[in-house]
């Protein structure tokens, strides 16, 4: 399946289709560019965002705990879309505050 992913970035809104077997960050890097990331392995917070609508599968990640994920935090480098989803990007400072 393919889902519509909407990224709310400091530069504005970006929308594109992402297959459910492709990490959102990997696809977004081709479509949007200029998204923050570091390890690309789900073990840091550089690419953190907040899901405001929809859902993702980020079971490959290890950095976030269950409470953070339930609150909507997402690591875009290890997140597959499981529905149409909206994510606010560039949220590392809020997550680590």
Curated annotation (Swiss-Prot):
[2Fe-2S] cluster binds at residues 39, 44, 47, 77. Coiled coil: none annotated. Residues 3-93 form the 2Fe-2S ferredoxin-type domain. Signal peptide: none annotated. Binds 1 [2Fe-2S] cluster. GO terms for cellular component: chloroplast stroma. Pfam families: Fer2. It is found in: Plastid, Chloroplast. Ferredoxins are iron-sulfur proteins that transfer electrons in a wide variety of metabolic reactions. Belongs to the 2Fe2S plant-type ferredoxin family. This is Ferredoxin.
């Amino acid at each position: 399946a393919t889902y519509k992913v909407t990224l709310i970035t400091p530069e504005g809104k970006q929308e594109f289709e992402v297959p459910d077997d492709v990490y959102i960050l990997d696809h977004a890097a081709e479509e949007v560019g200029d998204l923050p990331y570091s390890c690309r392995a789900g073990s840091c917070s550089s690419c953190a965002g907040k899901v405001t609508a929809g859902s993702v599968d980020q079971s490959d990640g290890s950095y976030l705990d269950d409470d953070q994920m339930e609150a909507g935090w997402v690591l875009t480098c290890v997140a597959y879309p499981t529905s149409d989803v909206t994510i606010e990007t560039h949220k590392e400072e809020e997550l680590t505050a």
